[in-house]
């Protein structure tokens, strides 16, 4: 499972270094499927990506919104393989959409990891703090036993 937060820099060529704790999870060849979602990049192992694609087939029948979601989530994904230094080259369009410039944050989220610009990550942290002040949300968290 992907866990933890790492602060890094994206180099001028658009490469990011995969943290060592993520490398074994990605697999021997290190290939990751990366797509844009909710303002950041989501990176999946090929195994997890196959599961997502299988689920997405059903979205075709659920109307225009779901069809568009599938089109952009799957259609914009890019298969990225690291070099010998475990650097992934993020395609320019994905870098631009996610606002990746210099400082980035990698966050492990169980079945995938996310790549955020430092500025957008700070915004997400602020939203989380706001969520934690919401009584209904706090009740949902309590139901999880946390």
Curated annotation (Swiss-Prot):
Belongs to the MraZ family. The gene is mraZ. Its main location: cytoplasm. Residues 5-48, 77-120 form the SpoVT-AbrB domain. Forms oligomers. It holds the Pfam family MraZ. It comes from Desulfosudis oleivorans (strain DSM 6200 / JCM 39069 / Hxd3). Keywords: Cytoplasm, DNA-binding, Repeat, Transcription, Transcription regulation. Coiled coil: none annotated. It is found in: Cytoplasm, Nucleoid. SUPFAM superfamilies: AbrB/MazE/MraZ-like. CDD domains: MraZ_C (cd16321), MraZ_N (cd16320). GO terms for biological process: negative regulation of DNA-templated transcription initiation. GO terms for cellular component: cytoplasm; nucleoid. GO terms for molecular function: DNA-binding transcription factor activity; transcription cis-regulatory region binding. This is Transcriptional regulator MraZ. It comes from the Bacteria. InterPro entries: MraZ, MraZ_C, MraZ_dom, MraZ_N, MraZ_sf, SpoVT-AbrB_dom, SpoVT-AbrB_sf. PROSITE patterns: SPOVT_ABRB.
């Amino acid at each position: 499972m992907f866990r933890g937060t790492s602060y890094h820099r994206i180099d001028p060529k658009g490469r990011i270094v995969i943290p060592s704790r993520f490398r074994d999870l990605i697999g021997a060849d290190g290939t990751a499927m990366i797509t844009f979602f909710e303002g950041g990049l989501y990176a999946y192992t090929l195994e997890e990506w196959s599961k997502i694609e299988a689920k997405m087939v059903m979205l075709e029948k659920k109307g225009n919104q779901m069809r568009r979601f599938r089109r952009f989530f799957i259609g914009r994904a890019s298969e990225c393989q690291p070099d010998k230094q475990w650097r992934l080259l993020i395609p320019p369009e994905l870098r631009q959409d996610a606002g990746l410039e210099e400082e980035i944050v990698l966050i492990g989220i169980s079945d995938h990891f996310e790549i955020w610009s430092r500025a957008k990550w700070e915004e997400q942290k602020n939203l989380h703090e706001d969520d934690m002040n919401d009584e209904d949300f706090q009740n949902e968290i309590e139901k999880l036993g946390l």
